[in-house]
């Protein structure tokens, strides 16, 4: 039984899907104006792992993750680069797909783009105005937060608490608002900006409305899980809830999940602090699976500290798991012990997708395998566990028949033909195969 920590209720809750054996997930994707950094990648990897575990347990997952392809940051970066916002966003969407593929992230069921949903966004805003949840002011449209019952319930704050923090704002946009907390659903166009015609004049969508529209258009008024980084809890997800539930009158998402930050020297990795490294840069020197494994070593809600040592440790541990998978099969293994490993793994992952505990089970199982318990069922179970973490090793085509050469070497040794035996060992070593002579016979692994 899978239990999820739901940010809305601040509690572990049994997962009950809206539709039996199906999970509908929406995860906020990147604003595509630059390469993603390791902190951004954590969200992609964390929710991919969650998706994979749902699939491991037999669920069909509809996994939707958007691309924000129109935004203030995109417009600014496109202007600086001398290209259109679409050209810039297309470039970095391609880069995102390439980077996350290297991290073993499965393609989403759909990756909706904001620019493809402008008509639906306008219709959504019109509906909110009709219901008196929104109002037009000088070409902008704002959401009335005071009309939203339990606004900011996700952030566990009251409207009065938030109003205190907003009371000192004096910018031009705030002057148009009925309440400083009211947020933009539609922004009037500025000279030279990308824009679309609407009942309120030329403009473009506000950030928060985009995800509400794409999520409900694709998955319906209520979805099972909405996810994203912890920094999206307020205001982004808070505003999504307010506008979505105002329009439909229904619960927007049954479970809210938020991943923790990647930190550097215990500070959040971010572009604004300048303490970030992009995935694109890291992949020049570090294998994508190593980065993936590093990001999986901590339970998704907890922060994870990025250090060279942590990456080095991930590389060593990944190599150990690969060598374990490449052990020769044995004839027997304790079926009950195998069953216990599978149960322990599921218990760990059922507990809010605790990858740290799940990986501990994987290494305990690897130790057991390396002690001589590696039948085909054991191998299959082990590979399925690793696949949950996105660890999938492709079968390498050998130029030699390893087992045949080992048998030939054993025969040479029995005949005291040590020159031939040594030559075979050298031949295997050239193929990256290391031989281990044990009291139970010869074992081999890839070096």
Curated annotation (Swiss-Prot):
It catalyses: tRNA(Cys) + L-cysteine + ATP = L-cysteinyl-tRNA(Cys) + AMP + diphosphate. Binds 1 zinc ion per subunit. CDD domains: CysRS_core. GO terms for cellular component: cytosol. This is Cysteine--tRNA ligase. Its EC number is 6.1.1.16. SUPFAM superfamilies: Anticodon-binding domain of a subclass of class I aminoacyl-tRNA synthetases, Nucleotidylyl transferase. A motif ('KMSKS' region) lies at residues 268-272. Belongs to the class-I aminoacyl-tRNA synthetase family. One of its GO terms (biological process) is cysteinyl-tRNA aminoacylation. Monomer. PANTHER family: CYSTEINE--TRNA LIGASE, CYTOPLASMIC, CYSTEINYL-TRNA SYNTHETASE. The lineage of its organism: Bacteria, Bacillati, Bacillota, Bacilli, Lactobacillales. Zn(2+) binds at residues 28, 211, 236, 240. SMART domains: DALR_2 (SM00840). Keywords: Aminoacyl-tRNA synthetase, ATP-binding, Cytoplasm, Ligase, Metal-binding, Nucleotide-binding, Protein biosynthesis, Zinc. Signal peptide: none annotated. Its cofactor is Zn(2+). It is found in: Cytoplasm. InterPro entries: Cys-tRNA-ligase, Cys-tRNA-synt_Ia_DALR, Cys-tRNA/MSH_ligase, CysS_C, Rossmann-like_a/b/a_fold, tRNA-synt_1_cat_dom, tRNAsynth_Ia_anticodon-bd. GO terms for molecular function: ATP binding; cysteine-tRNA ligase activity; zinc ion binding.
């Amino acid at each position: 039984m899978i239990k999820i920590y739901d940010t809305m209720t601040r509690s572990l809750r049994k997962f009950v899907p809206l539709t039996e054996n199906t999970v509908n997930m929406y995860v906020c994707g990147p604003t595509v104006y630059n390469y993603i950094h390791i902190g951004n990648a954590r969200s992609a990897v964390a929710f991919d792992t969650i998706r994979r575990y749902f699939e491991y347990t037999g669920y069909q997952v509809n996994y939707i993750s958007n691309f924000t392809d129109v935004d203030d940051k995109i417009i600014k970066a496109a202007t600086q680069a001398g290209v259109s916002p679409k050209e810039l966003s297309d470039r970095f969407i391609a880069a995102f797909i390439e980077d996350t593929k290297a991290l073993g992230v499965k393609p989403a069921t759909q990756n909706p783009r904001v620019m493809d949903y402008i008509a639906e966004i306008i219709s959504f805003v019109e509906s909110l105005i009709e219901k008196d949840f929104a109002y037009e002011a000088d070409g902008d449209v704002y959401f009335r937060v005071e009309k939203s019952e339990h606004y900011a319930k996700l952030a566990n704050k009251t409207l009065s608490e938030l109003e205190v923090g907003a009371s000192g704002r004096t910018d031009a946009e705030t002057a148009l608002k009925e309440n400083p907390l009211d947020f933009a659903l539609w922004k009037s166009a500025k000279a030279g900006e990308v824009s679309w015609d609407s009942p309120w004049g030329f403009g473009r969508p506000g950030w928060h409305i985009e995800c509400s529209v794409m999520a409900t258009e694709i998955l319906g008024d209520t979805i099972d899980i909405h996810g994203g980084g912890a920094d999206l809890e307020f205001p982004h997800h808070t505003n999504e809830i307010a506008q979505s539930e105002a329009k439909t009158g229904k619960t927007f998402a049954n479970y809210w999940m938020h991943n923790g930050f990647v930190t550097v020297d215990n500070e959040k990795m971010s572009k604004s602090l300048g303490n970030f490294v992009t995935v694109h840069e890291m992949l020049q020197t570090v294998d994508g699976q190593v980065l993936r494994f590093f990001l999986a070593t901590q339970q998704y809600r907890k922060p994870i500290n990025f250090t060279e040592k942590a990456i080095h440790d991930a590389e060593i541990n990944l190599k150990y798991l690969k060598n374990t998978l490449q052990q020769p099969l044995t004839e027997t293994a304790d079926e009950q012990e195998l069953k216990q490993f599978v149960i322990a793994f599921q218990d760990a992952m059922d507990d809010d997708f605790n990858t740290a505990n799940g990986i501990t089970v994987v290494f305990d199982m690897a130790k057991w395998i390396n002690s001589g318990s590696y039948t085909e069922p054991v191998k299959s179970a082990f590979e399925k566990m690793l696949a949950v973490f996105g660890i999938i090793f492709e079968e390498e085509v050998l130029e030699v028949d390893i087992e045949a050469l080992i048998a030939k070497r054993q025969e040479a040794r029995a005949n005291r033909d040590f020159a031939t035996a040594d030559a075979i060992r050298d031949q295997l070593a050239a193929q990256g195969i290391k031989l281990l002579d044990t009291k139970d016979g010869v074992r081999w692994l890839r070096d």
